[in-house]
């Protein structure tokens, strides 16, 4: 999804997002880790990231199991998406940078970018929001290359604006 296309979709959807009678639900899994997903990135603290294989499995640190590395990768993306007042533009930029850096296999990467772009447009129209994550889980705690896991996270976006949203203020 190009930046221009994303902004065009965001402009179309922003007025619906501004309507308090509308509920948006953005649903996505987070990291899909394991050989079957073709994603085996591992990074212990202070180490360079590696793609794990039979030849590189010696990089797994006993004090930092694979499932903690997955949580750290997801945590970087969640931290990028989370923001307070007037932060959607920065969140979008940081999220895209995090995806580029980690190659995280988030299925809904583009719906998340679209949501952040909608919020950015609304912030440009003087509205304020926050986005916070409330829960995180993994389908299994990976310990070896034979394991696989899918991560799940829950977040919310809420308006911090004192007045209701007015779609006519959008440009």
Indicate where each model-derived feature is located.
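Flexible, D/E/H-enriched segments
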Residues: 1-22, 33-171
């Amino acid at each position: 999804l190009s930046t221009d296309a994303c902004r065009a979709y965001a402009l179309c959807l922003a007025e619906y997002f501004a309507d308090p009678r509308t509920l948006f639900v953005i649903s996505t899994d987070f990291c899909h880790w394991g050989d079957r997903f073709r994603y085996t990135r591992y990074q212990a603290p202070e180490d360079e990231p590696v793609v794990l294989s039979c030849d590189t499995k010696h990089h797994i640190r006993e004090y930092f199991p694979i499932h903690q590395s997955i949580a750290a990768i997801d945590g970087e993306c969640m931290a990028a998406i989370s923001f307070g007042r007037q932060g959607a533009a920065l969140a979008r930029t940081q999220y895209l940078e995090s995806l580029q850096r980690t190659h995280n296999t988030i299925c809904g990467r583009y719906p998340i970018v679209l949501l952040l772009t909608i919020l950015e447009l609304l912030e440009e129209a003087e509205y304020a929001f926050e986005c916070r994550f409330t829960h995180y889980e993994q389908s299994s705690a990976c310990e070896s290359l034979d394991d696989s896991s899918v991560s799940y996270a829950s977040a919310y976006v809420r308006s911090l604006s004192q007045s209701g949203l007015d779609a006519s203020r959008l440009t």
